[in-house]
């Protein structure tokens, strides 16, 4: 649970990094972050949502993992690849 809790803080900060350049992705991730935190609190205070909260928490967590990794690719990898492709096309001309 410690790993989940640590990643929940990282996932919660993801919209802050995306806000200036990719607002649609940032806004799309906010509902999943809210659901993830509600389900985590339901897990801490056991019995809130019975057995449904286990599978829903894992689903919300995995969606947030996907969004955070997609955001990292968009923010860091795509600009790097784009600059390399520009240099490659300029060198072949």
UniProtKB/Swiss-Prot annotation:
Per UniProt, the keywords (alphabetical) are: Cell membrane, Germination, Membrane, Transmembrane, Transmembrane helix
Major localization listed first in the record, in broad terms: membrane
What does the similarity note say? Belongs to the YwcE family.
Q: Which GO terms describe its cellular component?
A: outer endospore membrane; plasma membrane
Describe the task this protein carries out.
Answer: Required for proper spore morphogenesis. Important for spore germination.
What organism is this sequence from?
Shouchella clausii (strain KSM-K16) (Alkalihalobacillus clausii)
Membrane protein topology class: Multi-pass membrane protein
Q: What protein is this chain from?
A: Spore morphogenesis and germination protein YwcE
Q: Where are its TM segments located?
A: 1-21, 25-45, 57-77
Q: List where in the cell it is found.
A: Spore membrane; Spore outer membrane; Cell membrane
Q: Does the keyword Transmembrane helix apply?
A: yes
One family from Pfam that matches here is YwcE
